[in-house]
Structures are given as C-alpha cells and as structure tokens.
C-alpha cells in the first residue's frame, strides 16, 4: 500500500510542480523564475504543514481568503476533479503493485519449487 502513496508520490508532486511551472511561464515568467517560485512555494508549504499539528484542510482554509485568488483557483481545481483524479491514480498504482507482486510470487515459485510446499 505504501508504494502507491509514498513510493510513487514524488512523481505526483513533480507532475503538479511541472503544471505550476508551465502555468507560470504562460503568465509571463521565465521558466527559471517560475521553477524557483514553485520550489520555494513547495518548500515553504511542506515546512508549514510539518510544523503544524493541524489537518492540511485547516491549513488550506487559513491561507484561503473568501472570494480571493486562492479561492478562485481552488474552485477550478475542485471543479476539474483534482481530488478524484488523484484518488483514482493512487488506487490504480495500488492495484498495479498488487499485480506486480502476484507476478513476482509466481516467478519465485518457478525458480524455487520448494516455495510451494
């Protein structure tokens, strides 16, 4: 289970970072500046979450002003199904890890017939 959440997690975060960087470039930032802004945002956010005992949803609400830019962006992310896509992707990774594990068990039985005893 951890593989689906943590083992493959860095790729999820990096994809999200890519999307943010690309959006920054679309807004007019150089790729270098957009990359640095996203890196600093990620670093600061992780530190903020690490230092707080509060749930991430509470922290998100604390940095979201009603009717503000963050609220607007989050509305569009939710409307676009971000949570559903992430949840389905992690479930698919979990299912894939089970399938790969089953394949490994079958290969081990072929290599070591005593494993069936």
Residue ranges and their predicted role:
Residues 1-36:
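Anionic-ligand binding region
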Residues 35, 39-117:
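NAD(P)-dependent Rossmann-like dehydrogenase/reductase catalytic/cofactor-binding core
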């Amino acid at each position: 289970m951890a593989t689906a959440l943590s083992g493959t997690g860095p790729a999820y975060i990096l994809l999200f970072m890519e999307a943010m960087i690309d959006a920054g470039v679309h807004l007019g930032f150089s790729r270098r500046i957009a990359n640095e802004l996203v890196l600093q945002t990620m670093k600061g956010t992780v530190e903020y979450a690490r230092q707080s005992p509060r749930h991430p949803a509470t922290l998100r609400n604390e940095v979201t002003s009603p009717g503000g830019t963050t609220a607007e962006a989050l509305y569009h992310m939710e409307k676009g199904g971000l949570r559903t896509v992430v949840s389905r992707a992690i479930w698919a990774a979990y299912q894939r890890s089970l399938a790969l594990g089953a394949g490994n068990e079958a290969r081990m039985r072929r290599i070591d017939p005593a494993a069936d005893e």
